[in-house]
């Protein structure tokens, strides 16, 4: 079993074929998520073409969601520019910067809306918040830690 610390957004209604800009305009709330993964089940599921059905048994969300204005200057270019702290068995293991997402939330939402209407209340996740390694004297280190166990094992 693995955890994945993520940022998520809750959308309003959006029509199929929406642009990334329209995706950003549809964001109503921001919250945190722990996207649970059963890593040993995922390879077989993907090989069968079923996707992440049994390998993703549950997702837990923060008890509070905030509007974009509550984030102030931390909300820029469709990304949350804050650190996300991850703990594992009560021990802090990650303090990763959420800003360097490969795709901003508008792009993620537009991708979702490519083949369907997106209804109010839809939740879109950032994927695991992860930061790149820093090389010092030929050795790679991850000063911000990690946001999932699989990432730690890959270090």
What are these regions (language model features)?
Residues 1-111, 139-140, 144, 149:
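Glycine-enriched loop-and-adjacent helix/strand subsegments that border the catalytic/binding cleft
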């Amino acid at each position: 079993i693995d955890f994945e610390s993520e940022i998520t957004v809750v959308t309003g209604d959006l029509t199929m074929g929406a642009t990334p800009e329209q995706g950003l305009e549809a964001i109503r709330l921001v919250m945190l998520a722990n996207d649970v993964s059963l890593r040993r089940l995922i390879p077989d599921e993907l090989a069968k073409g079923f996707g992440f059905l049994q390998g993703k048994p549950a997702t837990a969300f923060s008890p509070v969601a905030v509007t974009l204005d509550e984030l102030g200057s931390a909300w820029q270019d469709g990304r949350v520019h804050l650190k996300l702290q991850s703990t594992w068995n009560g021990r802090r293991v990650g303090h990763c910067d959420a800003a360097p997402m490969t795709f901003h939330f508008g792009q993620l939402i537009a991708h979702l809306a490519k083949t369907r209407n997106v209804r109010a209340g839809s939740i879109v996740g950032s994927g695991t918040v992860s930061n790149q390694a820093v090389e010092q004297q030929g050795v790679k280190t991850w000063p911000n830690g990690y946001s999932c166990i699989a990432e730690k094992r890959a270090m």
